[in-house]
Amino acid sequence: MRILDTTLFYTQASGGVRTYIDGKRQALLRRGDTSHKVVMPGSRVFFDGDFVSLPAMPLPLAPGFRFPLRLGLWSSIIAGLQPDVIEAGDPYTPAWAAQRAARLLDVPSVGFYHSDLFTLVHHRVGRFLDPGTRAYIKRLYEGFDMVLSPSRVMAEQLHRCGIGEVEVQPLGVDLEAFQPQRAKPNARRALGLSEDQHLLVFAGRGTQEKNIPVLLEAMRRLGPDYH
């Protein structure tokens, strides 16, 4: 089986979506009967083994990210790679290109709602765009054969936009990296924490949509037993 992922979130600067795709890729290639390709934004058309970069415009307010504009080019190259399944990991041009290529090839397409577009637009632009954003999300994700969400919260957001069937697919935890055997007692002592105190760690990008002020307020309310 030939599986293809496409998203503008697969860049050197990206985080969770790239981690998800890389983890999935490793699992697929271990099967031995599956090939996997990634189509991502770049400065020009460039083929590097299983990775294909296609032209996209740099985003001044999001360093490291590029936004594709050439829907026709993206869809034709994706179709030319002849995948059996296409998964789109964003709600932008790559998603529309994935759907168009899937129709050309008569293969299934999957939309993974990694990025909460509705909340992003609501907070950064204004609630006056809420109806239009919901209509856009509904129109886009109705075009996929399957819609995935990484959490129940995101799935409920899609339901509010009019998407009926959404499969919740948690991204999971890397158990090789995160396990009790890797605990370092010296780390707690270096922070001046007792054995009874709870240590909470946030690992992620410090961007607005991560709602870090909410996390900090939660920590304040939890009190001195939490660090």
Residue ranges of each PLM-predicted region?
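An amphipathic, basic-hydrophobic alpha-helix
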Residues: 60-88, 93-100, 104, 131, ...
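Nucleotide-sugar donor phosphate/pyrophosphate-binding loop at the beta->alpha transition
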Residues: 108-110, 119-139, 149
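Donor nucleotide-sugar binding/catalytic pocket of nucleotide-sugar-dependent glycosyltransferases
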Residues: 134-183
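Conserved donor-binding/catalytic core segment of Leloir-type glycosyltransferases
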Residues: 4, 194-220
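Active-site proximal beta-strand in glycosyltransferases
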Residues: 3, 85, 102-120, 148, ...
